[in-house]
Structures are given as structure tokens and as C-alpha cells.
Amino acid sequence: MHGLTRNARDFAGLAEQIAATRRVIVPEMRGRGMSDYAKVSDSYTPPTYVADVEKLLAEQGITRFIAIGTSMGGLMTMLLAHTQPGRIAAAVMNDIGPEVDAAGLARISGYVGQGRSYPTWVHAARGLAEAHGAAFPDYDLDQWLEMAKRTMVVTQNGRISFDYDMAIAEPFGKPGNAAPPNLWLAFEGLRDVPMLLVRGELSDLLSADTVKQMGVRNPAMQVVTVPRVGHAPTLDELEVRAAITALFDGAA
């Protein structure tokens, strides 16, 4: 499950790897990618996304599953663990925890829903580099181009724009909608679940202290810290892929 402004393309490489041995479903939340935009923007909240996923699971007849969530998708993983106890066989949470740092939320609030567009892919890549260079200080132009093509599309007017409904910003700015104020109770649903936590070394959303507290509540939790990366790792890093493979191999 993807982040706030992201889509299924973030998981293309990882999904291909996992699909060699398991069934994979990579949903795009309402308002992103190929999913319909919501008629009412107030529905762009984590509880609504979780309800959508619960409906998808029911339609597909899925009773037990491994959850992978980046950022907002990790919040959804915790909420699912709370509302669907016993159904998560294992979990990968990418740069997110029960407490979300205010600095990271403020940064996201500064760009979500801005509606920027670009004339070429190179312009789009450079725009991303300008906005997110602090989180990925070692990225070169090719890597920024890859990120641009994951997050943007060519629109009908020929310009390149972000692949989500700009209206997701409307409820995001309201208290409690960006991230529920306290998800420690929901995280308890993952206490006995095999779990991998991925953290960007430079993350401004997931603090080292929160990681430590998560480890106290789930002593079996494995942690991989990706060096010189902020929010959020791509899950394509070699050390992350190896850890995910090990988690899946041990999941019942």
C-alpha cells in the first residue's frame, strides 16, 4: 500500500519479485493512479482507505495476507491490524510508525495538492530534485527521472503532472486526517506478527526514538536502516530486498 501522493508503480519491481512465488495485489487508493477520484474530498482519509481495502479483501476472498505499506500505507497496515486481528501474517512498514514527526508532516503539507506541472520529463525530474533533494542527496538525474515516471503522468494538455487528485490535500490539512494522533493501540495488533521496519537514515517522519519504542512492543521486529536516504526508501535497495525475502520465507 502506497504513500499519500503515490501509486502502485512504487512497487513495480518488488511486486515482480514477490509474484514469482505468491499472489500479489497492489491497490491504488481512491484518487491515485488508475483508481477513480472521490466525489467527496472529505473521504480522502486513512479510515476510508482502510475500509476500501477491507472491501477489496472480502471481494477477493482473502482471509490472511502479508501487508506492505509505505508511509500512509504503513498507517493503513496498523489500522488493519487493529480492525482485522489475526489476519496479517507478516508486515513490512516503510518509514512510518505509530508516531509521526511534526517536521515531516509540515514538509508534506507544503507540497501536497500544489498542482505543479512540467513541459518535459527532465524538467519534472529537476523539480523533484529541488523539492526532495535533502531526502535523497546522492540521487543523479536518472534516479530523479525514474521517480518522476513513478509519480507523474502526461496529461491531456501534454504537460507532465502528478498522478493524483489534488483534492486529497483538502482533508489532509485537518487535525487527525494526515495521521491519527496516536496509533500505539493499533500497533499492538502487530505485537506478535513477524515484521520488518524499514527506515531512511535521514527520515523526518520516523524518529529513532519511535523505532526504539516499536521494538519494545514487538521484540521480534527486524529493522533495516537505509543510509543517506530520507522519506522514504524505495524498497528496491539490496539490503531491503534481502530482508523482505527473509521475512516472506518465514511467514506462515
Question: Which residues fall in each region the model found?
Answer:
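Active-site glycine-rich loops that stabilize anionic/oxyanionic intermediates
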Residues: 3-6, 71
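The conserved beta1-alpha1 loop
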Residues: 1-3, 199
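Catalytic histidine-centered segment of alpha/beta-hydrolase-like enzymes
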Residues: 229-238
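Conserved hydrolase catalytic core segment
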Residues: 63-102
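Short beta-to-alpha linker loops that shape the active-site pocket of alpha/beta-hydrolase fold enzymes
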Residues: 28-32, 97, 227-230
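Conserved serine/cysteine hydrolase catalytic core
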Residues: 153-216
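Conserved alpha/beta-hydrolase catalytic His-Asp/Glu region
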Residues: 119-173
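Active-site loop/oxyanion-hole signature of alpha/beta-hydrolase fold enzymes
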Residues: 12-20, 25-68
